C-alpha cells in the first residue's frame, strides 16, 4: 500500500461531469463534429415554478442493493435491513424566548414584518432569503420556511447563536409534506432549444452550468474518448499514456507536466486540443488529477500544473473542454464566450421535457457562523449543498440534499458540528467532509464532529448497479469526520473512494457501507491510520468494496479495495465486532502496531480475510508491524485462491506481527488458512500446520485455541482413483523423470536411498533448473490431490511446484498456486487443486499434450530431494464448500428464513453456525448490525483423525493432527 493517511497534504483540482473546478485532497502514499458554434435564437430560460415539489430533477439511476449476492459457486450473501431513508432526528427543544420569523416564496413580501406565517397590511412572511441579511437575526431566534416554497438563491445566515440559544432555520414543526427547498437549477424548456446539427441542440445560457440534469437520463460533460472507443478496454473512459511522463516541479508540486499520447488518440477531422482543453489523468490507483492543457504537439500534452506524482506509461487519461467532444447521447458542452449551451439528450430524442442547468454555487452558506440549526429543509441542483466551514456548534438535521456538482456538506475546520438524519444523494464530490483542504488551501480538519444516522448514496460517483455512469473524478470519502469525532448509524451506498474516513481519537460504529472504491482504489470502506490513533471501529457492516480497474495499465491490473483499512503507523486502534464481506481484503493493517482485531466476521473476501502488510522500518529496524492482537474472529474463504491470513514483510520475519488466538476458520473452499512471506521466502499453512506454530506472525504459538472446519471430524472429499504419476516409487530407475536448465553446466540428477525410501536428488546447474515428473493426463474441472516427500538444501527453501502442460506454452493447469517452503528435514506435503484445462495425449488439437508436475526455478547450485510423488483424482463432497452469510444491517434483530429454502430446501437442515458449530434452527435470529456465517455439513465422510482422508479409505488411523498425509492417510515415515 502506498496511501498514507494525512501524512502529506497534496492539493489536486478535480472537475467532474459538471465541469467546474473544485479542489480536493486526500491520502498520499495514491468522435464528433468540430463545427464551431453559431448564434442561436434567444429562447427564454425560466426558473422552476413556485412552489415546486421537493424532488430530484434527474433520474435516480442508482439501483437498489440486491437482497441476495452470489459470491462463488457455493457461497452466497443474504442481506436485509438496509434503510432506504434515514430515521428522523428527535424534535428540537423550545428555543428560549427568541423571535420567530417566517418566509414564503409564493405569498411573502420583503416589505412585510416577517413575524407571521400569513397576514396583510404589512404583517406577514418575507419572500426572499436575501431579506434575512437585514433582519437583525440574533441568538434564540427562529426562522420558519413555508412548506412547498422554493428559492433559487443561497440561504445565508447573518448572525451566530450561542450554545444555549442557537439560531434555528426550519420547516414548520408539523404537517410539511413538501419541504421548503433551495433549488439552484435554471430550467430550459423544450422551446429554449434549437437544432445545432444532427442530435445536438443548443440554447442560450449566460452562466456556465455546474452540471445538467434531465428526467430522460444522465448527462456528463463532453469528453474524449467515450466508453467503448478503445477496443482493448471497452468499459473504460480512458486512453493510455504511451510513455512515462517527465519529472518536474511546478507551483511547489513535483510530478509530470508533459504526458505522452499514443496511437489510441485519434482526433476527428477538424478537431484540435485548443484553449480550454483539460485533461484528467489517473496518476496511480488512488489519484485522478486534472489540469488545463497549454499545448499539444501531436505527441505530447503540456499541462498548466504538474500532476500530484510523476505519471507512468499505461495509466489512463481523458480529455474535456471542446465542442467536438460532444459526440454521444447524454453529453453537453458550454461555450462561455458565445454563452451557448450544447447538448445531446440522454435518450437521443429532440428536447421534449425540461432540462435543468445547475448554476447556483452554494445552497446554504453558514461559513464562520456559530450555533445555527438547519432542520427539515431541502437543497438540490447546486454546487455545494451546505457550506459550514469554520463554524462552531452548527447542526444540520432532517435535510434532503440532492444532485450536487461538488460537495454535499463542507464541514472543514468546524468544531462540535452535528450532522444528523440527513439524506444526501448524488454528490459529484464527497457527501460529508471535515477535510481541511476540501476547497483548496488547508484550513484545518473538523474536530469533535458528530455524523449520525445519515443516508448517503452515490458520493463522488453515479452508479447503476455495478456500472459507473459518471466520468472518473477524484474524491476522498463519502463521510470524513476529522479527529476526536464520531460516525454512527450512517448508511453509505456507493462511494468513488473511501466510505468513512477518520483521523485520530474517533468512534466509528454501527455504520453500513456498500460499494466503496468505485473510481479509485488502494482504498477501504472504513479507513484510518497514524500514530497514537486510538480509534474504536465497531459493529460496522462493510460489503462489496469494488476496486477500480479502469485507467490502470492493461498488462498489470489489479484492485486493492479493502473492507477496513488501518494504514501507515496505525496504532492503538480497536477493530471489533464488525462484518466485512466481498472486499479484496477484509481487514488490512499496513505497518500498524499495538492494534486489536477482535470478534469480527470476515466472509468471502476475495484475496484474504486479514492482511498484515509490512514494508517500512522507520521506527524499528526489523519492521514497524508489531504487537497486534488478532483474536476470536471468524474467517471464511469462499474461493480456492483466497486466504484466511496474509502476512507479508519486506524484511526478515513476520514473527513480531502480534498474537493470534481463538480464531475460527471455514477452510474448505481454500485449505490455506495462512500464508506468510518475508525476505527469506514464503510458506502456506493449512489449519493443522498453522495451529500452534511459531515464527510466522508471532513468536507465540498461533491459534492454539482456534478452530478449523478441516479438523471437525469430516473430510471434504473421497479418493476416486489411483496415482497418475508413473514410476513415482523409483523402484528400479528414474525413467520418465527429466531436468532442464539453460546455462552450462547442466544440473545433476541422482537416484539414491534416503529416509523417504528411494528418492531423486537434483542439484541445479549453471542456471535455475527444473525437475519434471513423468507425464499424465488431466481433465478440466476435476479435482486432484497431490502429495510428495521433500527435503531441501536449506531450511525454508522455496519450492515452486507447478502442474503444467508439458509443451506449447507450458501453462499452469491448476486453479491455485501450489508453491510451498520445505526444510532440510524430510517431510510430507499435501494439497488439493482443480484442473483448469484438459490435457490428454490421446486427444487431438491443443489438448493433445501431456501434463507434468515441475519443481520450477530451483536456484543455481542448490539441491532438492524428492520421493513418493503422488497425484490422485478426488471427488469433493458436494456440500463441503457450501456456505453463506446472513447479514442484518438494521437496528433491530432479524428473524431470518433459510436462504436456501426455495432452491435447496434439503440444505436448510444441514447448516451450522460458524461461531459455535451448532446446527441452525429456523427462523434464525440475527442480531442488529450483525451477521451469522453458516456452512453445510454432510455426515457421510467421517474423518476421525482429521487428516483429510475419509475413514473408509484411511490405512493409517490416528495420524498426527496437522501432518500432511498421502492418499492412504499415512504421514511421513522414515525408512
Task: Explain the meaning of each model-derived region.
Residues 745-768:
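Short carbohydrate-recognition loop motifs
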Residues 728-731, 771-796, 829-839, 867-869:
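Extra-cytoplasmic beta-strand recognition segments
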Residues 61-389, 395, 410, 463, ...:
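Extracellular polysaccharide-degrading/modifying enzymes targeting complex plant/algal/animal polysaccharides
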Residues 90-92, 97-98, 114, 939-975:
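Extracellular calcium-associated, cysteine-rich motifs in secreted modular proteins
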Residues 384-387, 406-412, 425-695, 699-700:
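Glycine- and acidic/polar-rich repeat regions and solenoidal domains
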Residues 707-742:
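Extracellular carbohydrate-recognition regions
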Residues 810-843:
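Extracellular carbohydrate recognition and processing domains
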Amino acid at each position: 500500500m502506498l496511501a498514507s493517511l494525512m501524512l502529506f497534504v497534496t492539493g489536486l483540482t478535480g472537475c467532474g461531469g459538471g465541469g467546474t473546478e473544485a479542489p480536493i485532497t486526500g491520502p498520499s502514499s495514491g468522435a464528433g463534429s468540430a463545427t464551431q458554434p453559431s448564434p442561436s435564437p434567444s429562447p427564454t430560460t425560466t426558473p422552476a415554478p413556485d412552489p415546486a415539489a421537493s424532488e430530484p430533477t434527474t433520474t435516480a439511476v442508482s439501483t437498489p442493493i440486491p437482497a441476495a449476492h452470489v459470491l462463488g459457486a457455493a457461497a452466497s450473501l443474504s442481506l436485509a435491513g438496509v434503510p432506504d431513508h434515514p430515521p428522523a432526528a428527535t424534535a428540537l427543544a423550545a428555543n428560549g424566548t427568541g423571535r420567530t420569523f417566517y418566509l414564503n416564496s409564493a405569498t411573502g413580501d420583503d416589505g412585510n414584518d416577517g413575524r407571521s406565517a400569513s397576514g396583510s397590511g404589512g404583517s406577514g412572511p418575507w419572500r426572499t432569503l436575501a431579506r434575512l441579511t437585514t433582519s437583525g437575526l440574533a441568538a434564540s431566534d427562529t426562522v420558519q420556511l413555508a412548506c412547498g416554497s422554493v428559492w433559487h438563491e443561497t440561504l445565508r445566515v447573518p448572525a451566530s447563536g450561542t450554545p444555549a440559544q442557537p439560531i434555528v432555520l426550519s420547516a414548520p414543526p408539523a404537517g410539511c409534506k413538501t419541504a421548503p427547498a433551495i433549488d439552484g437549477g435554471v430550467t430550459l424548456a423544450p422551446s429554449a432549444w434549437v437544432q445545432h446539427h444532427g442530435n445536438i441542440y443548443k440554447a442560450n445560457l449566460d452562466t456556465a452550468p455546474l452540471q445538467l440534469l434531465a428526467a430522460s437520463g444522465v448527462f456528463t460533460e463532453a469528453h474524449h474518448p467515450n466508453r467503448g472507443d478503445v477496443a482493448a478496454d471497452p468499459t473504460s473512459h480512458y486512453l493510455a499514456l504511451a510513455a512515462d511522463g517527465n519529472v518536474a516541479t511546478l507551483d511547489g508540486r513535483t510530478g509530470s507536466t508533459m504526458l505522452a499520447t499514443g496511437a489510441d488518440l485519434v482526433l476527428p477531422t477538424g478537431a484540435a486540443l485548443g484553449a480550454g482543453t483539460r485533461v484528467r489523468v489517473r496518476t496511480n490507483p488512488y489519484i485522478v488529477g486534472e489540469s488545463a492543457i497549454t499545448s499539444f504537439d501531436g505527441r505530447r500534452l503540456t499541462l498548466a500544473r504538474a500532476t500530484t506524482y510523476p505519471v507512468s506509461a499505461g495509466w489512463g487519461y481523458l480529455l474535456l473542454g471542446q465542442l467536438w467532444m460532444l459526440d454521444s447521447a447524454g453529453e453537453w458542452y458550454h461555450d462561455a464566450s458565445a454563452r451557448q449551451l450544447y447538448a445531446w439528450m440522454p435518450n437521443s430524442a429532440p428536447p421534449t421535457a425540461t432540462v435543468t442547468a445547475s448554476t447556483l454555487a452554494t445552497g446554504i452558506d453558514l461559513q464562520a457562523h456559530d450555533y445555527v440549526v438547519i432542520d427539515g429543509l431541502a437543497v438540490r441542483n447546486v454546487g455545494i449543498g451546505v457550506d459550514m466551514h469554520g463554524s462552531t456548534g452548527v447542526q444540520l438535521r432532517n435535510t434532503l440534499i440532492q444532485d450536487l456538482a461538488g460537495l454535499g456538506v463542507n464541514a472543514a475546520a468546524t468544531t462540535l458540528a452535528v450532522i444528523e438524519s440527513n439524506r444526501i444523494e448524488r454528490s459529484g464530490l464527497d457527501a460529508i467532509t471535515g477535510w481541511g483542504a476540501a476547497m483548496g488551501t488547508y484550513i484545518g480538519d473538523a474536530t469533535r464532529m458528530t455524523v449520525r444516522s445519515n443516508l448517503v448514496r452515490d458520493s463522488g460517483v453515479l452508479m447503476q448497479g455495478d456500472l459507473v455512469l459518471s466520468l472518473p473524478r477524484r474524491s476522498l470519502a463519502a463521510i470524513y469526520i476529522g479527529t476526536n469525532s464520531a460516525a454512527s448509524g450512517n448508511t453509505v451506498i456507493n462511494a468513488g473512494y473511501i466510505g468513512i474516513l477518520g483521523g485520530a481519537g474517533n468512534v466509528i460504529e454501527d455504520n453500513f457501507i456498500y460499494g466503496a472504491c468505485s473510481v479509485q482504489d488502494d482504498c477501504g470502506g472504513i479507513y484510518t491510520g497514524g500514530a497514537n490513533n486510538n480509534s474504536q471501529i465497531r459493529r460496522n457492516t462493510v460489503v462489496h468494496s469494488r476496486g477500480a480497474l479502469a485507467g490502470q495499465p492493461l498488462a498489470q491490473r489489479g484492485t486493492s479495495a479493502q473492507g477496513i483499512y488501518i494504514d501507515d503507523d496505525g496504532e492503538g486502534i480497536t477493530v471489533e465486532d464488525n462484518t466485512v464481506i466481498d472486499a479484496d481484503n477484509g481487514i488490512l493493517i499496513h505497518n500498524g502496531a499495538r492494534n486489536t482485531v477482535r470478534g469480527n466476521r470476515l466472509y468471502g473476501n476475495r484475496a484474504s480475510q486479514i492482511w498484515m502488510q509490512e514494508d517500512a522500518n522507520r521506527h524499528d529496524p526489523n519492521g514497524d508491524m508489531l504487537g497486534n492482537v488478532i483474536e476470536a474472529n471468524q474467517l471464511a474463504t469462499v474461493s480456492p485462491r483466497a486466504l484466511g491470513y496474509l502476512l507479508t514483510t519486506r524484511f526478515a520475519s513476520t514473527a513480531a506481527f502480534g498474537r493470534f488466538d481463538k480464531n475460527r476458520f471455514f477452510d474448505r473452499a481454500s485449505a490455506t488458512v495462512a500464508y506468510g512471506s518475508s525476505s527469506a521466502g514464503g510458506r502456506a499453512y493449512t489449519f493443522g500446520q498453522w495451529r500452534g506454530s511459531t515464527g510466522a506472525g508471532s513468536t507465540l504459538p498461533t491459534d492454539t485455541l482456534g478452530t478449523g472446519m478441516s479438523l471437525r471430524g469430516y473430510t471434504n472429499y473421497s479418493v476416486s482413483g489411483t496415482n497418475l504419476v508413473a514410476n513415482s516409487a523409483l523402484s528400479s530407475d528414474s525413467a520418465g523423470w527429466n531436468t532442464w536448465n539453460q546455462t552450462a553446466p547442466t544440473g545433476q540428477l541422482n537416484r539414491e536411498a534416503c529416509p523417504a525410501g528411494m528418492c531423486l536428488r537434483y542439484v541445479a546447474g549453471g542456471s535455475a533448473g527444473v525437475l519434471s515428473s513423468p507425464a499424465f493426463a488431466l481433465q478440466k474441472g476435476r479435482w486432484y490431490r497431490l502429495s510428495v516427500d521433500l527435503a531441501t538444501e536449506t531450511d525454508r527453501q522455496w519450492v515452486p511446484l507447478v502442474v503444467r502442460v508439458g509443451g506449447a506454452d507450458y501453462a499452469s493447469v491448476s486453479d491455485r498456486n501450489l508453491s510451498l517452503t520445505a526444510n532440510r528435514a524430510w517431510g510430507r506435503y499435501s494439497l488439493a487443486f482443480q484442473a483448469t484445462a484438459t490435457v490428454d495425449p490421446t486427444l487431438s488439437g491443443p489438448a493433445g499434450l501431456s501434463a507434468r508436475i515441475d519443481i520450477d526455478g530451483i536456484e543455481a547450485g542448490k539441491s532438492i530431494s524428492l520421493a513418493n510423488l503422488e497425484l490422485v483424482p478426488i471427488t469433493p463432497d458436494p456440500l463441503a464448500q457450501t456456505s453463506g452469510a446472513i447479514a442484518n444491517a438494521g437496528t433491530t434483530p432479524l428473524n431470518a428464513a433459510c436462504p436456501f429454502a426455495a432452491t435447496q430446501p434439503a440444505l436448510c437442515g444441514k447448516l451450522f453456525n460458524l461461531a459455535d458449530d451448532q446446527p441452525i434452527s429456523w427462523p434464525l435470529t440475527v442480531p442488529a448490525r450483525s451477521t451469522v456465517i453458516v456452512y453445510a455439513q454432510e455426515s457421510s465422510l467421517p474423518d476421525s483423525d482429521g487428516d483429510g482422508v475419509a475413514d473408509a479409505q484411511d490405512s493409517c488411523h490416528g495420524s498426527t493432527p496437522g501432518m500432511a498425509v498421502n492418499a492412504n492417510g499415512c504421514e511421513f515415515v522414515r525408512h
